[in-house]
Amino acid sequence: MLDANKLQQAVDQAYTQFHSLNGGQNADYIPFLANVPGQLAAVAIVTCDGNVYSAGDSDYRFALESISKVCTLALALEDVGPQAVQDKIGADPTGLPFNSVIALELHGGKPLSPLVNAGAIATTSLINAENVEQRWQRILHIQQQLAGEQVALSDEVNQSEQTTNFHNRAIAWLLYSAGYLYCDAMEACDVYTRQCSTLLNTIELATLGATLAAGGVNPLTHKRVLQADNVPYILAEMMMEGLYGRSGDWAYRVGLPGKSGVGGGILAVVPGVMGIAAFSPPLDEDGNSVRGQKMVASVAKQLGYNVFKG
């Protein structure tokens, strides 16, 4: 049994030590994100037996952004299976920025990773759907099943992103021309933009992590969301590419599958034990929350979790 006092102390200490850390800046290429108060910070744990521990602004709802890629990957694995995902998307780090076009050009148009923009747009196109609205509703539903029913599209975020997503539209057409997009290019880009524009709070983000940690069963609803056999593929992708250009450094220092988003959220999974999440808007040059990385790493270190430990 996990010690409740120890878990709350770990969360409290991480928040106290790092919630006012200086450094980084909000994402400024999406107007909505540029205006989120930079002083916000939160950290939370949700365990596989459904206990919740949090500190800071844990009720504040922020944009899911790139963490949505984990949810859509999970749905694609359910729809088409791991072999098709590997064949049609890939399972390798690109070694380049998350929005790189060069990565596509270097590999014949294949996106390699479902956790970079090109691969995520291709993954969105893999979802079984008869039209754009069905594709979107299925992706929203998997987000809600994984994290909580309160997850919802923000029209403000979506509008802010849809008016600035020209780079992703270009990526979608490159994928389409290379044969690595499996629906209409602008449909894929539209739905991908929507999936990044949902709002959730830090506890819900930790619940997403706990659902993965529990082999696909949401520990708060007790409902099976994913096949247990598909979860290791998600965690492997998170370990390789979850923090963009910092993924190797994160694996080396923290040793947990993770995923960040430019909305300031960051998630880590301790398989079989818990999800750890944090939120704070200022980002490093790779697009990861400066304080969030420190808070999650602190919790993991205090509790002694690292998947590479014996």
From Swiss-Prot:
GO molecular function, one term: glutaminase activity
Catalytic activity as recorded in UniProt: L-glutamine + H2O = L-glutamate + NH4(+)
Effect of residue 168 to A: Loss of activity
Top-level taxon of origin: Bacteria
Residues that bind substrate: 66, 117, 161, 168, 192, 244, 262
Keywords (A to Z) from UniProt: Acetylation, Hydrolase
Family recorded in the similarity comment: Belongs to the glutaminase family.
Protein name: Glutaminase 1
